[in-house]
C-alpha cells in the first residue's frame, strides 16, 4: 500500500539476498550458509547492497526499507551516509507467534507462491494449488532456525528501538 501510494520501491534485503542465492553468486552462496544456520549476513555486505540499491533512479523520490537496518552498525552507516528516514515503524510480535507463523510457511519454489499450514493452507496438503507440485519448507523457516534468528534479533536488532528513539537532528525520523 505505501509503495503504491507514494510511487516508491520496497527495498528488502531478504529479497536481494534470495535473488543472489538463486543466481548462485559468490555472495549468494556465502549468504545461504549463514542464513540457513540462522545467522545474519555481515553488515559490510548488507550496507554495500543497500547503498547501491538506493542510488538507483527509482529511489530518487524515496523508498521503503523492509527488514533493514537489522544492526546498530547498519543504522549508523545509514546516518553517516546522510540517508534521511521520515519514519521508523516497529511491529512488536511475541516470539511464539513469529515461530508459529514462520515455521508453518510452505513455498512453491518455481512460482514463489506461499502458503501457511494453518492460516492459508493449500487445497491438498503439501501441494501447490496451481501445479500440484510439492511445497517445501525453506531452511530458514524451520523452527530451530527461526528460534536462532530470534535470539540474534534480541541481541542485535532490538537495540535499534532505543537508537531511533534517541536520534535527534537532521537525520532523525519522526
Swiss-Prot record:
Pathway: Purine metabolism; AMP biosynthesis via salvage pathway; AMP from ADP: step 1/1. PANTHER family: NUCLEOTIDE KINASE. This is Adenylate kinase. It is an enzyme of class 2 (transferase). PROSITE patterns: ADENYLATE_KINASE (PS00113). One of its GO terms (cellular component) is cytoplasm. It comes from Neisseria animalis. Consists of three domains, a large central CORE domain and two small peripheral domains, NMPbind and LID, which undergo movements during catalysis. The LID domain closes over the site of phosphoryl transfer upon ATP binding. Assembling and dissambling the active center during each catalytic cycle provides an effective means to prevent ATP hydrolysis. The keyword Cell division does not apply. Its main location: cytoplasm. ATP binds at residues 105, 114-115. Residues 12-41 are annotated as: NMP. Residues 104-141 are annotated as: LID. Belongs to the adenylate kinase family. GO terms for biological process: AMP salvage. Keywords: ATP-binding, Cytoplasm, Kinase, Nucleotide biosynthesis, Nucleotide-binding, Transferase. GO terms for molecular function: adenylate kinase activity; ATP binding. Gene3D superfamilies: P-loop containing nucleotide triphosphate hydrolases. Monomer. HAMAP family: Adenylate_kinase_Adk. It catalyses: AMP + ATP = 2 ADP. Pfam families: ADK, ADK_lid. Its EC number is 2.7.4.3. AMP binds at residues 13, 18, 39-41, 67-70, 74, 138, 149. Catalyzes the reversible transfer of the terminal phosphate group between ATP and AMP. Plays an important role in cellular energy homeostasis and in adenine nucleotide metabolism. NCBIfam families: adk, PRK00279.1-1.
